[in-house]
């Protein structure tokens, strides 16, 4: 509130969903929930702590609830592509977008010195298929992306990057126009918010 910047929170799901209301009232603009894998096998094998203490369903409950409170496109579900079969990743995309959230897809990269250092990197063709599927579902379900200004990350492929894979048809054109209209509509809000933050910071400095 003092800076005017947008606030995004990456959280583990909780049983008491009303706790998210408190965060929204405090000024949270975005929620992100990382459940990583769709298949029970991969989720249990690679995320044993989450599987044991939380379970997958808790992540979807949290996404559905917070998306219902904030609106479409302001909640994300994070998944890792390239470890489990892409059919499972596509199921995850369906579940996330059914919640009104957008998928944040991290492509698996084997890191030297890690437990999965020798695990093979995913094929480009399969990852392209995954991102094409993601943008198709976002277009189909009219989940807006890229509305907030100046959001740049290097670790993941942003949903907006997948627009290059979308079909050049009327649905895509309408979706692009929809996102553009929303961006224009909320731009004054973001500008006012940042200006208020600038004034507060100047007052504190003086």
Which residues does each PLM region occupy?
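Conserved AdoMet/S-adenosylmethionine-binding subsite of the radical SAM
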Residues: 1-119, 126
